[in-house]
A protein has these predicted regions:
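Charge-rich amphipathic alpha-helical interaction elements
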Residues: 1-150
Length: 150
């Protein structure tokens, strides 16, 4: 039986590399999104802690001079939260874009892999039928040779 050789092997290797790169990019985007979500949770916790501290201070003594910096700190934290929310939205959009890119690369690889499998099975069937024909020819020639000798 002749060995099977896939002529599109370089394309298959390129598509495997493209899939790996797309998967790595997608994974990095997921990690970046998760880090931003952790940062957002931390900022929200800081805001809650600051608001609790301010309410404790107000229960003891309310002084407008101490309240102004507290309000500025709250506004600053809220701006950071809004900025982080915006960054998360961008990261999620990028993550979705990279997910689609990965799926495209995966589908391209799968199509070439299916083609390779199809060609390989066709090759095996062809080689098997050739071998069977060759065996039949050998058997028939022996039979004819033996028939002619008798």
């Amino acid at each position: 039986m002749r060995a099977f050789s896939f002529r599109l092997e370089p394309i298959l290797l390129l598509r495997e590399g493209a899939r790996k790169n797309a998967l790595a990019s997608y994974a990095r985007s997921i990690i970046a999104s998760k880090e931003l979500e952790k940062k957002l949770d931390s900022l929200k916790k800081s805001l809650g802690d600051l608001q609790k501290d301010i309410s404790k201070q107000r229960q003891k003594v309310f002084s407008p001079s101490t309240d102004v910096p507290n309000q500025a700190a709250i506004v600053n934290l809220k701006k950071k939260i809004d900025s982080t929310n915006h960054s998360i939205e961008e990261a999620k959009a990028n993550e979705n874009k990279l997910r689609l890119k990965f799926l495209d690369a995966d589908n391209a690889l799968k199509s070439v892999s299916r083609l390779k499998e199809k060609q390989e099975s066709a090759h095996i069937e062809e080689q098997t039928s050739r071998e069977e024909l060759a065996l039949e020819d050998v058997i028939n020639s022996r039979f004819n040779f033996n028939s002619n000798i008798r």
